[in-house]
Amino acid sequence: MDLVDPSQSAAAAAGTQLVKDEVAEKCQKLFQDFLEEFRGSDGELKYQSDAEELIRPERNTLLVSFVDLEQFNQQLATTIQEEFYRVYPYLCRAVKAFARDHGNIPQNKEFYVAFQELPTRHKIRELTTPRIGSLLRISGQVVRTHPVHPELVSGTFLCLDCQTLVRDVEQQFKYTQPSICRNPVCANRKRFMLDTNKSRFVDFQKVRIQETQAELPRGSIPRSVEVILRAEAVESCQAGDRCDFTGSLIVVPDISQLSTPGVRAETSSRVGGREGYEAEGVQGLRALGVRDLSYKLVFLACYVCPTNPRFGGKDLHEEDMTAESIKNQMSVKEWEKVFEMSQDKNLYHNLCTSLFPTVHGNDEVKRGILLMLFGGVPKSTMEGTSLRGDINVCVVGDPSTAKSQFLKHVEEFSPRAVYTSGKASTAAGLTAAVVRDEESHEFVIEAGALMLADNGVCCIDEFDKMDTKDQVAIHEAMEQQTISITKAGVKATLNARTSILAAANPVGGRYDRAKSLKQNVNLSAPIMSRFDLFFILVDECNEVTDYAIARRIVDLHSRIEESIDRVYTLDEVRRYLLFARQFKPKISKESEDFIVEQYKRLRQRDGSGVTKSAWRITVRQLESMIRLSEGMARMHCSDEVQPKHVKEAFRLLNKSIIRVETPDVNLDQEDEHEVEEPQEGINGDADVPNGVNGHINGINGHAEETNAAPPKPSLRLNFAEYKRISNLLVLQLRKIEDEDDENETSQRKSELINWYLKEIESEIDSEEELVNRKQIIDKVIHRLVHYDQILIELIQTGLKGTEDENVAKEEDPYLVVNPNYILED
C-alpha cells in the first residue's frame, strides 16, 4: 500500500520542497516487517491479535515489547532507541498500515505505538540534554495529576483573506498557524481561523512525578519533572502511584515564563536591518514571543506501568488477585520459600526479628506493626458503607525508646510508605492541596502524604506536636479512608486507604505512671479512638536491659553486617506478605462467640469504676479486635479466623487499652482526694511488673519497719501485691455468698481479717510482723470499700438519718462484694 503523508501533499501544494528522511523511512519499513513477521513462543504471529483489537473505537495504541524488537533486528532496535523522537511518527504510520491490513480501519483514525520492557531504567536526576530525543524508561512517584484535555495535533486552517483551506498543519506543543497561505496569489501570513471540525485532536494529560525517597542522594532535594501522556496512556496513573514511564525527553517552550503578568507575550519589536531581513533569526516562535527564549525539559511518555507490580506496585491491594496469579509471578524457588515460611511453627516471632533486627526488645510493638502490615479485610455493607481493613497503630514513649526507628524501618520495608513529621506538616500537606496550574491557571489537586500512601503505610512522627486543626483533618482519613476537599471551586472525595503508624511523646517528655494514658498524651478522644493499638514504651533503669541495649548498639557500630540476625531476608518477607494479603479470612461461629465474649468483658470492665480503661471502650475497639484477628489469620495463610487468632488479638488490644505501668498504692490516704487514681490502671494481666519505688517487698509482702520519727512515711503497697490481696478477699466473700446453708451470706470485717491472717500464717515469723500484716489488711479493706467500691459495708439496723444511725457506723460491719464488680483473670 502506497502511503502518502498528508502533510507532504499540503507542503507540495504550497510549493515547499521537503527533504526526505531516509533513515526514518527505512525504520518504518523494517518496523512494519517486524510486526508482520515476528512470532511468539507458540509459533503464532504475536502482534496480529493486538492489531485486530485496534478496530475498537477506544483503542488506538499498539503495545510492542522492546525485547522482541531486539531479538528480531538489533540494528533497528538501536536506531529506535537512539533516534526515537525522530522516527516515532514513521513508526506510527507503520502501525496504521499494519492495522489496515488486518481489519476495516477508518481512514482518519490515528494510531500510536508504545514500547514496554526497556532493559535500563533511568533516574529523574539523570535526565539531561544529551538524552533528548532518545527512548528512555524513568521511574518516579506521581505527585500531581491534571485533568484530561483535548490536544490539537494537526490543525486545518481557513484563510480569512481568500477562504483557502490549509490542511494538516502540525502543532508542536503550542498553537501553530500556517506560516503563509498556500494560495500563490494570497500573501496572508497572520489572518487564519482554525476549523475544529476538520482538525485532529487527541487526549492529553499532564502529570508531575518526583524522585522516590530510596533514589534520593543524602541531603538532596527531590527533583521533579512533568510528564505528558497522550491517547490511551491518560488516566493510567493516580497521585501517589509509583510508576515507570517509557518515552523520550523533549524540549518545549516554557509558556508560563513567557506569559508573565504585566508583560505582553508577543514578539518583541526588533531594530530592523536591511529590507527583507527583519524576521531573520529565531523562527517558529511567532505566537509566543522571544522575550526570554525560555525552554524546559518535559518527558513525553508513550507507555505507563506500575513500578515493580509483583511486590509493592498498584497490585498490592488489587481485589482480583488470587493465590494462583501470585504463584505464577514467582519463580519455583521463590514459591518454595513462601510455602516453607507458611509451615514455620515459629513464624510470628521469626517475622518480627527479620523485620526489626536492629531494635532490641519491644516485642509487643513489633507484633503490632507486623499485624498492621498484614492488615484486616476491608468490607462493604449492603447499603454501600465501607468498613476499613487497615490497622492504625500509635507508639507513645519516652525519648530514646526507638519510636522513630520503628517508623523508619517500616518506611524502608513497605513498598508504598510515606514518612512525615507532625510538626512540619499542615492539614493540606497531609491530605491534599488545591494549587493553581501555572500554565492553564486552573485549580488542580496536589496529593498530600495520606494520598501518596494510598494502599500503603503513612508514618507520622511527632504526632502529638501537630496543631489541633491539622489533627482534625485526618479524622476522616483514619476511619472512612477518604479525603473530602471543598475549596477553590474544587469538590472532590479522594481515596486514602492507608494504615497510619504514629509516634508521640508524652506530655512533659516523660511518661507519668501515676496518670492514665489519656492524661499522658496530647491527643483528642476522637483521634485516640481511631487507633486500633497503643503501645507505651517507658525508659526504665534496668541493669540487664541497659546492658543488652548497649551491647547491641556497640555491635552495630563495630560489626554492622555480622550483628544483624535475620531469619528471612526482606525480599522473602515482602513476597510472603504479598501472598498472605490475598487471603480473605472469614470469621467462624466459634470465633464470633469468642469475640463477643471478649468485647463484653472490655465493656464491663470499662463501666465499673474499679478498672477504668486507659480510654473509652467503644464499638471501634470491637472492630479493632476483628481486624487484628483477621491479620493474624492472614499471617498464618488461613481462610478462617480461629479462636487462637482472636486470643492473640485480644491480648494485644488488652495491652494497649489498660495502663501498662501502675503506681504504688498509698494506703494512708484518709479522706483525701489525691490526684493519683490507681484504680484507673488496674490490670489483670500476669505481665504487670511489680510496683516500683514501693516500701513493701513485692515478692512476699513483708512490710518494712518504719521509724516513728516525724514526718511519718505513708504506708505504700506495690500494686501487684495490692491486687493479689484484693482478689483473695473477693473470692472468699463470693464463696461465702454462694453457700446454700442457712448461715449468713456475708462476713464481718474482723472475721475476714482473721481468715486472711490464718491463710498467710506460714509467712509470719514474729508478733511484730503479725501487727504489721493486720494493719495492712485493715487499710486494704478500707480502701476497697471507700475508694475502689469493690466491697460494700452492710448496715444492719435502721435507715440513714434515723435514731439508730450510730449503730450503722459500727466498728465491725458486714462486708459483701459489689455485684457489678467483674473479677479479672
Curated annotation (Swiss-Prot):
Protein's cellular compartments: Nucleus
EC number, UniProt record: 3.6.4.12
Gene Ontology biological process terms from the UniProt entry: DNA replication; DNA replication initiation; double-strand break repair via break-induced replication; mitotic DNA replication; premeiotic DNA replication; regulation of DNA-templated DNA replication initiation
SS bond list: none
Stretches assigned to the MCM domain: 347-554
Chain positions of motif Arginine finger: 529-532
Molecular-function annotations in GO: ATP binding; ATP hydrolysis activity; single-stranded 3'-5' DNA helicase activity; single-stranded DNA binding; zinc ion binding
Entry binding sites for ATP: 397-404
Residue ranges, annotated region (Disordered): 668-690
Catalyzed reactions per annotation: ATP + H2O = ADP + phosphate + H(+)
Stretches annotated zinc finger (C4-type): 159-186
Enzymatic class: hydrolase
InterPro entries, alphabetized: MCM, MCM6, Mcm6_C, MCM_CS, MCM_dom, MCM_lid, MCM_N, MCM_OB
Key words of the record: ATP-binding, Cell cycle, DNA replication, DNA-binding, Helicase, Hydrolase, Metal-binding, Nucleotide-binding, Nucleus, Zinc, Zinc-finger
Superkingdom to which the source organism belongs: Eukaryota
CC terms in the record's Gene Ontology section: MCM complex; nucleus
Similarity-based family: Belongs to the MCM family.
Function according to Swiss-Prot or TrEMBL: Acts as a component of the mcm2-7 complex (mcm complex) which is the putative replicative helicase essential for 'once per cell cycle' DNA replication initiation and elongation in eukaryotic cells. The active ATPase sites in the mcm2-7 ring are formed through the interaction surfaces of two neighboring subunits such that a critical structure of a conserved arginine finger motif is provided in trans relative to the ATP-binding site of the Walker A box of the adjacent subunit. The six ATPase active sites, however, are likely to contribute differentially to the complex helicase activity.
Subunit structure: Component of the mcm2-7 complex (RLF-M). The complex forms a toroidal hexameric ring with the proposed subunit order mcm2-mcm6-mcm4-mcm7-mcm3-mcm5 (By simililarity). Begins to associate with zmcm3, mcm4 and mcm7 into mcm complexes at the neurula stage.
PANTHER family, per the entry: DNA REPLICATION LICENSING FACTOR MCM FAMILY MEMBER, DNA REPLICATION LICENSING FACTOR MCM6
Protein name per its UniProtKB record: Zygotic DNA replication licensing factor mcm6-B
Origin species: Xenopus laevis (African clawed frog)
Gene name of the record: zmcm6-b
